[in-house]
């Protein structure tokens, strides 16, 4: 049996593990039935998504992780449109940045126990620092695999909705949790533009000075915003915040 066959041919025991993960993740029973009707194909795709690159096989999760990224963004956009239609463009971008973030993906991965079902090399398993990344990558690949099996964006949205409801409530209750830089980049890429470019200057040498650093942000050479802060990070955050505000005007 070749390495490729390990992923392409799914044993009965492996199939039970995959179905157990889908059930534990609260995927709707009707969607699981759809998968079972095309079982040979779907199990192969799901097993591919659950095979980490560290396992050193030619077929691994990367292709489906890439697909999952696109599916996740679309599903999150439709979720926000449906649940928060009155949010401004800037606030929508800020919220979506959280709903598709690696942090959120890792959180979902932990909750559904994806790491215990993934094929991962022992060395990677022992690397505690890589655990969040592995869970995030696996969850995103699983999203891509489920879409490839179900071909139904509504099914993906319905599956993720309970997890998004919790995250949305936390983010909207605490605006400071939002990542303005990520939100601005989300907006920029959604418009087909380049990533924002931040330019920072140190205005004073005094520690604790709230305007020690000055930052401007440009998107494709267009000035979008400026901000000051006691650190480079805070100045960037303020510049991105101003840019997002301008999008709503």
Swiss-Prot record:
Mg(2+) binds at residues 65, 137, 140. Belongs to the ribonuclease III family. Its EC number is 3.1.26.3. Keywords: Cytoplasm, Endonuclease, Hydrolase, Magnesium, Metal-binding, mRNA processing, Nuclease, RNA-binding, rRNA processing, rRNA-binding, tRNA processing. Homodimer. It comes from the Bacteria. SUPFAM superfamilies: dsRNA-binding domain-like (SSF54768), RNase III domain-like (SSF69065). Residues 227-249 are annotated as: Disordered. InterPro entries: dsRBD_dom (IPR014720), RNase_III (IPR011907), RNase_III_dom (IPR000999), RNase_III_sf (IPR036389). GO terms for cellular component: cytoplasm. Residues 179-249 form the DRBM domain. GO terms for biological process: mRNA processing; regulation of gene expression; rRNA processing; tRNA processing. The active site is at 69, 140. It is an enzyme of class 3 (hydrolase). Residues 236-249 have a biased composition (Basic and acidic residues). It catalyses: Endonucleolytic cleavage to 5'-phosphomonoester. Its cofactor is Mg(2+). Its main location: cytoplasm. Digests double-stranded RNA. Involved in the processing of primary rRNA transcript to yield the immediate precursors to the large and small rRNAs (23S and 16S). Processes some mRNAs, and tRNAs when they are encoded in the rRNA operon. Processes pre-crRNA and tracrRNA of type II CRISPR loci if present in the organism. Residues 29-151 form the RNase III domain. GO terms for molecular function: double-stranded RNA binding; metal ion binding; ribonuclease III activity; rRNA binding. This is Ribonuclease 3. It is found in: Cytoplasm.
């Amino acid at each position: 049996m070749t390495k490729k066959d390990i992923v392409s041919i799914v044993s009965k025991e492996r199939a039970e593990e995959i179905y157990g993960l889908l059930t534990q993740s609260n995927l709707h029973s009707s969607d699981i039935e759809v998968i079972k009707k095309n079982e040979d194909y779907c199990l192969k795709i799901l097993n591919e998504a659950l095979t980490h690159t560290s396992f050193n096989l030619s077929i691994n999760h990367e292709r489906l992780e890439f697909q999952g990224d696109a599916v996740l963004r679309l599903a999150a956009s439709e979720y926000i449109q449906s649940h928060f239609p009155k949010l401004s463009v800037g606030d929508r971008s800020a919220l979506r940045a959280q709903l598709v973030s690696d942090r959120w993906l890792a959180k979902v991965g932990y909750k559904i126990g994806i790491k215990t079902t993934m094929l991962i090399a022992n060395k990677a398993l022992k690397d505690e620092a890589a655990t969040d990344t592995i869970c995030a990558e696996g969850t995103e690949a699983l999203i891509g695999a489920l879409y490839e099996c179900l071909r139904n964006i509504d099914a993906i949205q319905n599956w993720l909705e309970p997890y998004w409801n919790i995250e949305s409530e936390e983010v909207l209750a605490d605006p400071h949790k939002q990542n303005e830089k990520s939100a601005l980049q989300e907006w920029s890429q959604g418009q087909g533009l380049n990533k924002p470019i931040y330019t920072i200057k140190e205005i004073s040498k005094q520690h604790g000075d709230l305007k020690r650093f000055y930052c401007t942000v440009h998107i494709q050479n267009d000035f979008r915003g400026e901000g000051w802060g006691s650190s480079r990070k805070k100045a960037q955050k303020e510049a991105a915040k101003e840019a997002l505000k301008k999008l709503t005007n």
